[in-house]
């Protein structure tokens, strides 16, 4: 009996597929651990949270860093996620020559409803292994922010974050990369709805 194996792509192969037209601009995909993953569609609560973040984040971050949304971050050797938001260091070429790498990333943010388990079970070890120091999940099921920091590797080789803090939707959180800046979560989380 033969066993089917999944084809895992390198970053170069993934980029080449894009150059050859295998993907369309409206495809919502990302490369995670060598696999091409179709991202979940976004519901109205998810989109509302994204819009609220778009209203708040540019005003707060200003010119101190670069804010990107649903744009690639290159995590060699086989991942290129497109988080809902990332705050990355400013660069003279504004990332024209390459996507941000882990050393450029100050904070990654995901808005999670139907993707919550994936953002916790897959993205946490992915970002921790890459050395992303801070990762926030706007958890729309429980209506709170999960703030992860201090990436580590355990004795079995698994990656994660040693620090997890919960911030309720009416709290204010400071940015780890800019401790003098804060985000009022009441302006971000939509009113609680049952899913």
Task: Annotate each language-model stretch with its function.
Residues 1-195:
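Gly/Pro/Ser/Thr-rich low-complexity, intrinsically disordered segments predominantly at protein N-termini
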């Amino acid at each position: 009996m033969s066993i089917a194996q999944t084809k895992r792509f390198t970053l170069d192969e993934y980029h080449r597929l894009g150059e050859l037209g295998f993907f369309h601009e409206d495809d919502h995909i990302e490369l995670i651990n060598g696999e091409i993953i179709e991202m979940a569609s976004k519901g109205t609560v998810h989109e509302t949270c994204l819009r609220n973040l778009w209203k708040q984040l540019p005003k707060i971050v200003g010119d101190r860093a670069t804010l990107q949304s649903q744009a690639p971050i290159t995590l060699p050797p086989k991942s290129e996620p497109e988080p809902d938001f990332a705050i990355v260091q400013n660069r003279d070429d504004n990332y024209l020559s390459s996507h941000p790498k882990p050393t450029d990333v100050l904070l990654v943010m995901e808005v999670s409803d139907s993707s919550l388990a994936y953002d916790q079970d897959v993205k946490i070890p992915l970002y921790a292994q890459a050395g992303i120091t801070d990762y926030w999940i706007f958890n729309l099921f429980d209506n709170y922010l999960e703030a992860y920091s201090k990436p580590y590797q355990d004795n079995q080789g698994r990656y994660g974050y040693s620090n997890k803090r919960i911030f309720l939707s009416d709290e204010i959180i400071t940015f780890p990369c800019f401790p003098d800046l804060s985000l009022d979560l009441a302006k971000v989380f939509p009113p609680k709805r049952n899913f």
